[in-house]
Amino acid sequence: MLLSKAQYDEIALFITTLRPTRQCMRRLKERFPCQSQSTLLSIFSQEYQKLIKRTHAKHHTPEAIEMYYARYLNEVARDPTVPILLELANEVDFSPALIARTVLERFLQDHDGQPPTKPILSSMLRDPSLIPDPVLANQVHLCIINDCCNGPLVDGIKHAIGHEHEVLLRQKLKEHNLAFLDEDQLRLKGYDKTPDVILEVPVAVDGHVIHWIESKASFGDEASHNTYLHDQFWSYWNRFGPGLVIYWYGFIEELDCNRERGILLKDGFPESLVTLGSCMAQNAEHGQHTKSRLSETHQETQS
């Protein structure tokens, strides 16, 4: 699904009025019924990540951490059944999963007498039953399952969706009888930074020859696309030549401006692509047709 910059900006502006809850997607879909839910969810997630980056520092000052932890202790002493951390996250307009991580880290520092290691903290967020306090474990669990943009649950879903679309890409290539090397095969050959697939024989898409394809199970906005260009796409271009990027959930159409330089954008697997074999067949057919016409013309001239 392609959006103009103006359409994208309208969606992004509306997202600033929403909080990262499961209900926000219903409001977003009601406001933009013509857009697919997967596209809207991808845009929402990316816009919310930008907000998190902008406000992350103020929620992690020593003063903020102590305030959140004290608030949790006071509220839980009053009524441990209330979703305190979830309500706190909504109140300060920050990610529930990240608020839970902050309070859990502070709790473990009190409990163990020293800050927890990152692996321990991450394992407890993935499996709150490992948290030594059952009340806090439940509070963290509520934050994790109610955060639609951050946390181990969301990370797992994103990873699964990304893998699913990589599998879809490989299936499409096989359906078109296109030989390719995937990331695992390329790493065995010693490549460290590679696209998802490299075509063993280049193909033409919209009149442009491509050597590789990168799958992105996300929406291509300006910020993410420019980051990918800098960190990935131009590196692929330098090493392997021109290629194709598939943003499965759409992109801002104005970003597809590097075709002549060798990077094409699509929002799905190309409907029409031209292989070297089909080119040769077409050329042979054209040559045979031309030869026949010349022969006919010669015979007409002789008669």
Swiss-Prot record:
Q: Which InterPro entries match?
A: CDIN1 (IPR029404)
Entry annotated with the keyword Glycoprotein: no
Could you tell me where this protein is found in the cell? Nucleus; Cytoplasm
Pfam family membership, one:
TPD
Question: What's in the keyword line of the UniProt record?
Answer: Cytoplasm, Nucleus
Decide whether keyword Cytoplasm is in the record: yes
Gene Ontology annotations for the cellular component aspect, listed alphabetically? cytoplasm; nucleus
Question: What role does it play?
Answer: May play a role in erythroid cell differentiation.
Q: Which PANTHER family match?
A: CDAN1-INTERACTING NUCLEASE 1, SIMILAR TO CDNA SEQUENCE BC052040
- List the protein's name: CDAN1-interacting nuclease 1
> Native species of this protein?
Xenopus tropicalis
